[in-house]
From Swiss-Prot:
GO cellular component assignments: cytosol
Protein name listed in UniProt: Cytidylate kinase
Keywords: ATP-binding, Cytoplasm, Kinase, Nucleotide-binding, Transferase
Signal peptide: none
GO MF, one example: dCMP kinase activity
Pfam families, per the entry: Cytidylate_kin (PF02224)
Species the sequence originates in: Burkholderia cenocepacia (strain ATCC BAA-245 / DSM 16553 / LMG 16656 / NCTC 13227 / J2315 / CF5610) (Burkholderia cepacia (strain J2315))
Broad class of enzyme this protein falls into: transferase
GO biological process entries: nucleobase-containing small molecule interconversion; pyrimidine nucleotide metabolic process
Amino acid sequence: MKSTRPFHPTPVITIDGPTASGKGTVAALVAAHLGFHLLDSGALYRLAALASVRYGIAAEDIDALVKLIDDLHITFREGCAQLDGVDVSNDIRAEAVGNRASAIAVHGPVRAALVARQRAFRKTPGLVADGRDMGTVIFPDAVLKVFLTASAEARATRRHKQLMQKGFSANIDDLLRDLRERDARDSNRAAAPLKPAADAKLLDTSALSVDEAVDQVLQWYRALGQPA
């Protein structure tokens, strides 16, 4: 049965899920297929953190951080995060950048500025946004909300493969333990806990290929009467 969700002139598809569920890859491929803009919300926080370090802005200088976030020139493409036109995908994964991201995100005005930047990615012809609270907090009016799930074992295997391909060593048992601990933290946190929106489509990717997951998202989008 076709959905009665109203058409939005600038449609948004949200793809949320836990770490290593495949949401980033699926989101990028769906966006590429539709010719939509792409938002990697997790990378956005790290990009802001990296920029604050490069421009010498202290983690406690709230006003300067807010202005920096407002002025950032950021672009996302499949597997690539660009800051001021330069690919910094590897730079933002550094532990120091992650620590800085956590340090600046404790400030309410900084979080508000980051939320505003995320919503500003909504531009014609449309947006695919991936993260943890895209469908519940950032884009509650999205035309399609997808929540990807996968077993912890499947996600640990994927993450291990990703790290090995990038030349990093990793112990799969340690990765599995870390994923389970992070799942517990994300699901139980007070602010924007990791959970599907009430109207989200659930997609278990444990036994699906990337192409199969992308095809399912596109099928759901077409079923809404949207061109795909």
